Amino acid sequence: MCGQADLALLGIEMKVIFVRHGEPDYHELEERSYTGFGLDLAPLSEQGRRQAQELCQHPLLRSADLLVSSAMTRALETASYVACATGLPLRVEPLLHEWQVYQTGRGNFEKARSLFLENNGALLPSSPIQYETAEEMKARFVDCMAKYRDYQTVVLVAHRMLIRQFVPDRQIDFCQVIECEIEI
């Protein structure tokens, strides 16, 4: 069961078919010491490409009116497979990016993720690491998706932490498909 966005503007219900991107390959970027948003340039791994190809067989994808993707490379590459297989029009949305941690480094990301989960998405004043809260992510999502209210069903290729704000599962696998009704 998916959660309702508490930040509904007009209360228009939209079916969202969430898809987490395929497995990325950070190897080349890490070798060159890329950090922060630089790591978001990572393409899919070979396994991630296979996952995206298999994803294209999912019957729910063909029930959609539109395909919307995060602008981050791993999501956009996954969406390109879906667009080719389904013929759905593709829109790229930079505001559907990965959850933001305001200190760089993989260790900080994992520490922030643990704090986020422990604090149910809140940022405590004493937090040693600053990060985007659950409410901020939901607001960003609703602001971005408001322009698509005229569509009944949208496939959305995005990231685990963003998807988790509407789906109770802590673990969302690469290229997993989750159908939700969300008020936008």
Question: Which residue stretches match the model-derived regions?
Answer:
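Flexible, charged surface loops at secondary-structure boundaries
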Residues: 10-12, 60-63, 147-151
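Alpha-helical packing segments of well-folded alpha/beta enzyme cores
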Residues: 51-55, 75-78, 133, 137-144, ...
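Phosphate-handling substructures
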Residues: 28-29, 38-43, 84-140
